Structures are given as structure tokens and as C-alpha cells.
């Protein structure tokens, strides 16, 4: 999941070297924290959060194939 999120985020932003993803495993859920450069935050979130919603949808659909529950947090 982490690699997929990195791939998606790096292709959306102007500064792909500033993209990082941190994994946090909970009891029943894996949380991925996405960090990007402040100037690229709008590109990852999108108008009215549409891009962020689609990123979360893609990651969740991939996680369902492996039977995992995943949430994506975009951290500034």
C-alpha cells in the first residue's frame, strides 16, 4: 500500500522528493500518513477534496484485495 500511495502522490506534485509516507499499524487498521511540500498540498487534496477522496478510494480498494483495512491521512 505504501508503494502505491508514494507512486500516486509523486506523480501529482511538483516536488516528488518531498513526498513521504509513514505507516502506523493499529489493532485492526493500517494508517498511512502522507506528507508533501506545503506548496503541493493543494494538488494532493484537490478542489473540494476530490483528489484526496480518490486517492483514499484507490488505496482502500487495493487493501480489500489483501483483506486489510487502511486509512490515508494527509498531514501538513
Model-based region annotation:
Residues 1-43, 51-76:
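RNA-contacting regions in translation and RNA-metabolism proteins
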Amino acid at each position: 500500500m505504501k508503494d502505491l500511495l508514494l507512486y500516486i502522490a509523486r506523480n501529482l506534485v511538483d516536488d516528488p522528493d518531498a513526498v513521504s509516507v509513514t505507516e502506523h499499524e493499529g489493532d485492526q487498521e493500517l494508517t498511512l500518513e502522507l506528507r508533501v511540500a506545503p506548496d503541493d498540498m493543494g494538488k494532493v487534496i484537490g478542489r473540494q477534496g476530490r483528489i484526496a477522496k480518490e486517492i483514499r478510494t484507490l488505496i482502500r480498494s487495493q487493501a480489500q484485495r489483501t483483506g486489510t483495512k487502511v486509512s490515508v491521512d494527509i498531514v501538513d
